[in-house]
C-alpha cells in the first residue's frame, strides 16, 4: 500500500489547475468517495478516504472554492489484516446547494448516477481532474513485481461507463467490469497505466512505478527492442513510436470529434507500439489490411492538423 499512498499524496499536492478543473476533481472525489446521504429526515454529503492528505484537500477545497465548511473525522476499524484508518469528510449545512454546485444533483434536484455533464463535456483539463479525483477516492494500483493494473471502484454502473468514456478522450482505453457486485474501471496495459498516472499529475510516482515493475510483458517488449539486429526493424520501431505520439496528440486535439474507424486505428497504434501495420490490421475488428490501417492513421493525423490550423486562424 505504500506506493498507492504515495500516489494519492502526490495527487493531493498537485497544483496549477483552473477553477473548473478543481471543481471537477472535487465533484469526482465526492461522487466516488460517498455522495449524498439521507440522515434523520435530512441529507448530508459524505466522502470516505484512506488518505488524510486527500481528505484535507477536499475539506480545504470545499471551503476555498465552494464556500462550504466541512469536518474531517478519523475512524479506525479492525479487519482480519489489522486496523484500517479512514478519514470521513462530512458536510451538514447547505447540503443541497453544494450538491447542485458539484453536480451530485441536476437542476431538477434529481441525483446524478454518473458524472456531472459539465465534467463529461468539459475540457481535457477537467477530464484529467475527474480521473484524479476518482483515483484519489477509490483508486488501486498494483505493487511492483505483480501483474500490472490500475483500477477504480465505482459507485454505479453509470459512473463506471462515464469514467471509461472520458478516458477515451485522453486516448486511453479503460475497461468496465463487474466484480462481486462491484463496478470497476480497469487499466492493465503498463504503458497505459504509466500514461494515466502522468496525466493525473503523479509524474514522480509514475517513474517509480515504471522503474520497479518487473512485468513479464514489459520485459518482453524491452527484450524485443533491445535485440533488434536489423536496421530496418529499428527504423520501423522508431517510426511506430513516433506515430503513436502523433496519434496521442491528435486524440487530445480532436476530443470526441473523431470518426469511429479512425479512432479504432489510432487506438491500436497507441496500444501496440511494438507491432507492425500488418499485425495491427490482423488484430483489428474486423480485420483489415496494413494499407487500410496506414490510411486511417494518416487521415486521423490530417484531420487533427486541419483542426489545429482552423483554431489558430480563428485566434488571430
From Swiss-Prot:
<comment type="similarity">
    <text>Belongs to the WhiA family.</text>
</comment>
<dbReference type="GO" id="GO:0003677">
    <property type="term" value="F:DNA binding"/>
</dbReference>
<keyword id="KW-0131">Cell cycle</keyword>
<feature type="DNA-binding region" description="H-T-H motif">
    <location>
        <begin position="276"/>
        <end position="309"/>
    </location>
</feature>
<dbReference type="InterPro" id="IPR003802">
    <property type="entry name" value="Sporulation_regulator_WhiA"/>
</dbReference>
<keyword id="KW-0132">Cell division</keyword>
<dbReference type="InterPro" id="IPR018478">
    <property type="entry name" value="Sporu_reg_WhiA_N_dom"/>
</dbReference>
<dbReference type="Pfam" id="PF10298">
    <property type="entry name" value="WhiA_N"/>
</dbReference>
<protein>
    <recommendedName>
        <fullName>Probable cell division protein WhiA</fullName>
    </recommendedName>
</protein>
<keyword id="KW-0238">DNA-binding</keyword>
<dbReference type="GO" id="GO:0051301">
    <property type="term" value="P:cell division"/>
</dbReference>
<dbReference type="Pfam" id="PF02650">
    <property type="entry name" value="HTH_WhiA"/>
</dbReference>
<dbReference type="InterPro" id="IPR023054">
    <property type="entry name" value="Sporulation_regulator_WhiA_C"/>
</dbReference>
<dbReference type="InterPro" id="IPR027434">
    <property type="entry name" value="Homing_endonucl"/>
</dbReference>
<dbReference type="InterPro" id="IPR039518">
    <property type="entry name" value="WhiA_LAGLIDADG_dom"/>
</dbReference>
<comment type="function">
    <text>Involved in cell division and chromosome segregation.</text>
</comment>
<dbReference type="Pfam" id="PF14527">
    <property type="entry name" value="LAGLIDADG_WhiA"/>
</dbReference>
<dbReference type="GO" id="GO:0043937">
    <property type="term" value="P:regulation of sporulation"/>
</dbReference>
Amino acid at each position: 500500500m505504500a506506493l498507492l499512498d504515495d500516489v494519492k499524496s502526490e495527487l493531493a499536492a498537485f497544483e496549477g489547475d483552473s477553477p473548473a478543473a478543481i471543481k471537477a476533481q472535487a465533484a469526482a472525489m465526492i461522487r466516488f468517495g460517498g455522495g449524498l446521504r439521507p440522515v434523520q429526515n435530512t441529507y448530508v454529503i459524505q466522502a470516505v478516504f484512506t488518505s488524510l492528505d486527500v481528505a484535507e484537500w477536499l475539506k480545504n477545497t470545499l471551503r476555498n472554492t465552494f464556500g462550504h465548511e466541512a469536518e474531517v473525522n478519523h475512524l479506525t476499524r479492525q479487519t482480519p489484516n489489522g486496523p484500517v484508518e479512514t478519514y470521513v469528510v462530512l458536510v451538514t449545512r447547505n447540503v443541497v446547494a453544494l450538491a447542485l454546485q458539484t453536480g451530485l444533483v441536476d437542476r431538477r434536484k434529481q441525483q446524478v448516477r454518473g458524472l456531472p455533464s459539465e465534467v463529461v463535456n468539459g475540457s481535457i483539463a477537467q477530464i484529467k481532474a475527474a480521473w484524479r479525483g476518482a483515483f484519489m477516492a477509490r483508486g488501486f494500483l498494483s505493487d511492483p513485481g505483480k501483474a500490472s493494473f490500475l483500477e477504480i471502484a465505482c459507485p454505479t454502473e453509470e459512473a463506471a461507463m462515464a469514467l471509461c468514456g472520458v478516458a477515451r478522450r485522453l486516448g486511453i482505453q479503460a475497461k468496465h467490469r463487474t466484480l462481486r457486485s462491484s463496478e470497476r474501471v480497469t487499466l492493465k496495459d503498463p504503458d497505459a497505466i504509466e500514461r494515466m498516472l502522468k496525466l493525473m499529475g503523479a509524474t514522480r510516482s509514475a517513474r517509480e512505478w515504471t522503474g520497479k515493475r518487473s512485468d513479464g510483458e514489459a520485459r518482453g517488449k524491452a527484450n524485443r527492442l533491445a535485440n533488434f539486429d536489423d536496421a530496418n526493424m529499428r527504423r520501423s520501431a522508431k517510426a511506430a513510436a513516433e506515430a503513436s505520439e502523433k496519434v496521442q496528440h491528435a486524440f487530445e486535439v480532436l476530443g470526441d470529434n473523431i470518426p469511429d474507424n479512425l479512432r479504432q486505428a489510432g487506438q491500436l497504434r497507441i496500444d501496440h507500439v511494438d507491432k507492425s501495420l500488418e499485425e495491427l490490421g490482423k488484430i483489428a475488428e474486423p480485420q483489415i489490411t496494413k494499407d487500410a490501417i496506414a490510411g486511417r492513421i494518416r487521415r486521423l493525423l490530417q484531420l487533427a492538423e486541419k483542426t489545429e490550423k482552423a483554431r489558430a486562424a480563428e485566434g488571430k
